[in-house]
Amino acid sequence: MNSTLAIAKPRIAVPVIALFLYAIASGYLMSVIPLALPQYGLDHSLASWVASAFYAGLLIGAMMMEPLVNRIGHRFAFIASLLVFIFTIAVLVVFPVAAIWLAARLLAGISVAGIFVTVESWLLHGDEAGRAKRLGLYMGSLYGGAALGQLGVGVIGIEGMLPIATIIGLLMLAVFSLMFGHSDQPESGHSDSLSLKQISKLNQAALIGCIVSGLTLGAIYGLMPLELSNRGIDRENVGSLMALVILGGMAVQPMVPWLSKYLGRTLLMAMFSLLGVGALAMTFLQKDIATLAVNLFLLGMATFALYPIAINLACDKLETRYIVSATQVMLFSYSIGSVLGPVVADLSMGENNGLMSYLFLSLLATCIYMLIMSVKGRREVMMS
């Protein structure tokens, strides 16, 4: 048993470290972009479109990354995706033009799809019993890094070249860790694509969970900094509050595998959706920053829990050779939500509690749907 653990650790250590470094850089960049638009002579109204362009790229990338990963392997696919992402950041600085920024963020989304498909399928390979724990480690690294990145807004700021230099430096460290770190990986070409018939038989609650995760997280990443700024919160506290959202997402990850032992995954998504509804309701009732901080942390727990639960539900009892394809389908579903989320949420941004109202309605509908599906699934089990 000890020898097995010794083999497993280096296999996941390198991609997790690289993901953590990427997450710090990406988390910082996500807040810098909407806040720094005026610095580059661009209008604040571009923020939602830039966010949607990124997630449109994620959607496109989700459809095309499986063959690349199978052809060149997980390590090189990860490195290539990071290098393309670095290129898109440099383009933003050199060409401060709205159309070029939209194109650059579209390409950035495609490259990030490569990162997600690569790391998720890398960690989902292996024994099924430890899959939830590996996904928890993946999500914890992703969200923990993103939370640290959000703090960069207050510590480093958003002006000048230092933020961009810091972001690119972190991404280069991620590239070097993949180039020189020791790890094994799933064999290239060792996966099959799911047919349309097989995709249609994937768990519907898992697909909806991924879509809602995109609808909520896309809006949070793209518009929450502006929502907080519109409330009169200063820039340093905006970064801290965004970090709290992501820390909530990080804190919930160890809870998900543990709760999955006792509760069905569909019911679990309903419970976390209800937690988000309650947290958002409190932001309507109490306006002070302390209450806002606590409830943003709870909102982070609720929204960031949905994706790992959904993807684990989708891959439950799935043959190993279909895992890359299944993660691509789940990422595609997430991306659909992520593209629509910022644009739909932007329609309510001019109203009081605009973004919060959008998130409230999204999570309330999800809670009701998941409860219905949970009861339906339990009845089917009892009748069989």
Name every feature range the model reports, one short phrase each.
Residues 99-107, 290-298:
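Paired small-residue
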